[in-house]
């Protein structure tokens, strides 16, 4: 019997504001002593009243627009009631009945090249919980994270397999990263994902019983958990069993999901309107201001790079994959006035260094203006491409004007015809066999003589002039 998988993803994304969502406590919870970035509001003390951080609302709107959502001009906060040590109030302020954003869509392309669209059901503003640190004998709680602003992005159950889930998460992460509203790092905990998985017989329209899997600390873990849970549920059904609606925990070490608790229904949380916060009213002016701040996203940028800079699809996709890398590239283009050479340098030399040093483009020490100037020196025949690579290596430790480096190191390209002639004559005199080989029709001999000439000039001779001079002498 054939089955199909139905997947919905719930993504929690921390917003990168300076202060928490309901109070003025510092939101940079990891760089503080435990339980020091707290106040009566974020620890739920009696009588303490929350107030919405306006920056949270702007960031939330920006994220929703990036994901193609409709913005509700009026929305409300609600209380989700439950008891757990990481929630000091014994409830979470969220948006259940009327979220601020709904009905989004994300276009994705899988690694195998398949295109699809995944609907986003809703996005809601809520607060994070305290951070639990589990040891062998106890659980420690750091309330610095309590009330750090979150948005929860809930997809529609339209993802068909683990490959699509991976593409959805990567696309979502890339678009949110471009808005700069979040670090979107699963490693740092600013992006977290729960996977809802169910299976049904192929052709059926009714959804199967779903499970929710937590503790997914990477996109690869999400993929593995979905694949495991799909196979587990199919096996249960094939053996005549019944899938239990429950929350399961991903065990990374053993690559399995394990039961955690029975899955709660909405009624279990006794949602009711938050009495201490007014409705969110999003004005036309506010929405317009946020729209004006929206960036050009990676897919849009890639298309422009292809049209404007005549790059191929792979080059454009790589250069636009990160906003900072795209900005670096365009600054090199601006200074060098050569999009082709700029792309070559960024895609080869610069990405090589980033990979070797395991750093981001923001941490790269060489300013884009200096790469642009280096390219201009090549175009002006001041230095050869080979010497340019030597200058680049110097730039990695001495980030200064490449023109100064070239002058200080005596690296200016030899373009004087008489000097070129002397170099070529010496090489021909020292390599009579190669001269005979060339005259006998062996084309590789010319490459050898070129190489010897460049070596004699220590890479400083103009390659084109060397080549022309060798040919002239051999045919003369």
List where the protein language model places each region:
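Core structural elements
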Residues: 189-201, 306-330, 339-357, 369-371, ...
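Amphipathic alpha-helical core segments of compact helical bundles
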Residues: 16, 231, 326, 330, ...
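C-terminal non-catalytic interaction appendages of large macromolecular assemblies
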Residues: 143-148, 186-193, 202-205, 412-476
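Extended, non-catalytic structural segments that build the interaction scaffolds
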Residues: 287-293, 330-335, 341, 371-383
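Extended, structured, electrostatic nucleic-acid-contact surfaces
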Residues: 299-306
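Basic, nucleic-acid-interacting segments
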Residues: 1-296, 313, 334-338, 348-351
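Strongly charged, low-complexity linkers/loops
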Residues: 361-372, 376, 382-455
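Extended hydrophobic-aromatic, low-complexity segments
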Residues: 280-281, 316, 328-330, 341-342, ...
């Amino acid at each position: 019997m054939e089955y199909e998988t139905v997947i919905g993803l719930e993504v929690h994304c921390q917003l990168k504001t300076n202060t928490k969502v309901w109070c003025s406590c510092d939101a940079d919870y990891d760089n503080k002593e435990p339980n020091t970035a707290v106040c009566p509001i974020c620890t739920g003390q009696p009588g303490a009243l929350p107030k919405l951080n306006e920056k949270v609302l702007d960031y939330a709107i920006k994220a929703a627009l990036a994901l193609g959502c409709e913005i509700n001009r009026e929305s409300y906060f609600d209380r989700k009631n439950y008891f757990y040590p990481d929630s000091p109030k014994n409830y979470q302020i969220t948006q259940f009945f009327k979220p601020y954003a709904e009905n989004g869509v994300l276009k994705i392309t899988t690694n195998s090249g398949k295109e699809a669209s995944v609907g986003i059901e809703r996005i809601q503003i809520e607060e994070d919980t305290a951070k639990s640190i589990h040891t062998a004998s106890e659980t420690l709680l750091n309330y610095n994270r309590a009330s750090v602003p979150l948005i929860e992005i809930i997809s529609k159950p339209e993802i068909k397999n683990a490959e699509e889930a991976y593409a959805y998460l990567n696309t979502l992460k890339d678009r949110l990263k471009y808005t700069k509203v979040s670090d979107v790092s699963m490693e740092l905990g600013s992006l977290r994902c729960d996977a809802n998985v169910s299976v049904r017989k192929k052709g059926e329209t009714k959804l199967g019983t779903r499970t929710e899997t937590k503790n997914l600390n990477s996109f690869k873990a999400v993929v593995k958990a979905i694949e495991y849970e799909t196979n587990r549920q199919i096996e249960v059904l094939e053996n005549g069993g019944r899938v239990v609606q429950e929350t399961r925990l991903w065990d990374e070490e053993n690559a399995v999901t394990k039961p955690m608790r029975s899955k709660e229904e909405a009624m279990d949380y006794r949602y009711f309107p938050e009495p201490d916060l007014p409705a969110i009213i999003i004005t036309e002016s506010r929405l317009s201001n946020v729209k004006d701040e929206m960036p050009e996203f990676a897919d849009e940028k890639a298309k422009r790079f292809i049209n404007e800079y005549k790059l191929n699809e792979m080059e454009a996709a790589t250069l636009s994959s990160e906003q900072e890398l795209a900005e670096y590239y365009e600054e090199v283009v601006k200074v060098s006035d050569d999009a082709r050479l700029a792309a070559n340098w960024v895609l080869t030399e610069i990405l090589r260094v980033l990979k070797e040093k395991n750093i981001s483009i923001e941490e790269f020490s060489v300013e884009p203006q200096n790469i642009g100037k280096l390219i201009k020196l090549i175009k002006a025949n001041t230095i050869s491409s080979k010497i340019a690579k030597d200058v680049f290596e110097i730039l990695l430790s001495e980030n200064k004007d490449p023109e100064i480096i070239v002058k200080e190191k005596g690296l200016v390209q030899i373009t004087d015809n008489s000097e070129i002639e002397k170099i070529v004559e010496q090489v021909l005199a020292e390599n009579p066999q190669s001269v005979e080989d060339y005259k006998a029709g062996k084309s590789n001999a010319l490459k050898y003589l070129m190489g010897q000439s460049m070596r004699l000039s220590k890479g400083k001779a103009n390659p084109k002039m060397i080549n022309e001079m060798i040919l002239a002498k051999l045919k003369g």
